[in-house]
Curated annotation (Swiss-Prot):
Pfam families: LpxB. Condensation of UDP-2,3-diacylglucosamine and 2,3-diacylglucosamine-1-phosphate to form lipid A disaccharide, a precursor of lipid A, a phosphorylated glycolipid that anchors the lipopolysaccharide to the outer membrane of the cell. Keywords: Glycosyltransferase, Lipid A biosynthesis, Lipid biosynthesis, Lipid metabolism, Transferase. Its EC number is 2.4.1.182. The keyword Repeat does not apply. The gene is lpxB. GO terms for biological process: lipid A biosynthetic process. It is an enzyme of class 2 (transferase). Pathway: Glycolipid biosynthesis; lipid IV(A) biosynthesis; lipid IV(A) from (3R)-3-hydroxytetradecanoyl-[acyl-carrier-protein] and UDP-N-acetyl-alpha-D-glucosamine: step 5/6. It comes from Escherichia coli (strain K12). This is Lipid-A-disaccharide synthase. GO terms for molecular function: identical protein binding; lipid-A-disaccharide synthase activity; phospholipid binding. One of its GO terms (cellular component) is extrinsic component of plasma membrane. It catalyses: 2-N,3-O-bis[(3R)-3-hydroxytetradecanoyl]-alpha-D-glucosaminyl 1-phosphate + UDP-2-N,3-O-bis[(3R)-3-hydroxytetradecanoyl]-alpha-D-glucosamine = lipid A disaccharide (E. coli) + UDP + H(+); a lipid X + a UDP-2-N,3-O-bis[(3R)-3-hydroxyacyl]-alpha-D-glucosamine = a lipid A disaccharide + UDP + H(+).
């Protein structure tokens, strides 16, 4: 009598955020099926949970057109090899975690061979290049989406999608401890505090830092003792920000932080930030915010024609209205940014209303995403 093979799940993660999601999914699946086998492209966290890595995640973690072109032959070789090896292995389910440019084609290749496929983390198809939804529909049996409006978009096109909530919403408390965060950063409990988050990419820090610093200078006129915290994602961004500050606002005293973005948000009365995941994190930290964003004029012109949503920040997309002020392009200038931030720093009605809505939205997307994703995989594997 042949021994029944264990549940076999193939996974591909292409960057650190995907490695974190993959590790959480594997952990949740092992609770249900302790002897399951996990195999594919994995980072250190997934490997620590027991995933066999046929390739290291770093192989796929390339950014920017020039880098991708330089590595294209290798990336195509890896995808062809995975198509062949997964085809021979016949896993019960394949889970492509984010990395849509790599994974969606791979999912399509495997689906043609009768392998069930899941795409975990929806690309921003609801915002731009909406026709990608048809390719995703052909390539996958199921999309796992972090946000409810993403599921609504897929439903419109009859592409199977399951809203599982957001892992970040699971990780962050509904009621953060502001004073504890201030103690960590050395900020007095009774001070007014502003966080500046000019982005994680070099181009963003270059475009936004000067305006953000000038905004802080204006706010200091109203709040002379205003504490200003600036978390920067790495040494490179810190160096870049310090150079810009030396030119624009050499006398402005600020607390520069290495990482610690979440602590800075929790500790602050208001934040001025670039759009992106930081806006969602800031909402979950219950920190009132203003989104300021600039890009090169041609890029902005193009984006305006391609982007199909009314808002750029996730809190507004979740709320379905302008909950958070978005000041983009010409609007992203110190006078307007300062005017939008002043009522938030006052800690009055505006801030409290925003805080309450942030809490409601947090509850909506706090669904134990790892467990929800595991349930979806197990149901498809049957």
């Amino acid at each position: 009598m042949t021994e029944q093979r264990p549940l076999t799940i193939a996974l591909v993660a292409g960057e650190t955020s995907g490695d974190i999601l993959g590790a959480g999914l594997i952990r949740a699946l092992k609770e249900h099926v302790p002897n399951a086998r996990f195999v594919g492209v994995a980072g250190p966290r997934m490997q620590a949970e027991g995933c066999e890595a046929w390739y290291e995640m770093e192989e796929l973690a390339v950014m920017g057109i020039v880098e991708v072109l330089g590595r294209l032959r290798r990336l195509l070789h890896i995808r062809a090899d995975l198509t062949k090896r997964f085809g021979e292995l016949k896993p019960d389910v394949f889970v492509g975690i984010d990395a849509p440019d790599f994974n969606i084609t791979l999912e399509g290749n495997l689906k043609k061979q009768g392998i069930k496929t899941i795409h975990y983390v929806s690309p921003s198809v609801w915002a731009w290049r909406q026709k990608r939804v048809f390719k995703i529909g052909r390539a996958t049996d199921l999309v796992l989406a972090f946000l409810p409006f993403e599921k609504a978009f897929y439903d419109k096109y009859n592409v199977p999608c399951r809203f599982i909530g957001h892992t970040m919403a699971d990780a962050m408390p509904l009621d953060p401890d502001k004073n504890a965060a201030r103690d960590v950063l050395g900020i007095p409990h009774d001070a007014h505090c502003l966080a500046l988050l000019p982005g994680s990419r070099g181009a963003e820090v270059e475009m936004l830092s000067a305006d953000f610093l000038k905004t802080a200078q204006l706010l200091r006129q109203t709040y002379p003792d205003l504490e200003i915290v600036v978390p920067l994602v790495n040494a490179k961004r810190r160096e870049q920000f310090e150079r810009i500050k030396a030119e624009v606002a050499p006398d402005l005293s600020v607390h520069l932080l290495d990482g610690m973005g979440r602590e800075a948000m929790v500790a602050s009365d208001a934040a001025l930030l670039a759009s992106g995941t930081a806006a969602l994190e800031c909402m979950l930290a219950k920190c009132p915010m203003v989104v300021g964003y600039r890009m090169k004029p041609f890029t902005f012109w193009l984006a305006k024609r391609l982007v199909k949503t009314d808002y750029v920040s996730l809190p507004n997309l979740l709320a379905g209205r302008e909950l958070v002020k978005e000041l983009l392009q010409e609007e992203c200038e110190p006078q307007k940014l300062a005017a939008a931030l002043l009522p938030l720093l006052a800690n009055g009605k505006t801030s409290h209303a925003m805080h309450d809505t942030f809490r409601e939205l947090h509850q909506q997307i706090r669904c134990n995403a790892d467990e929800q994703a595991a349930q979806a995989v197990l149901e498809l594997a049957q």
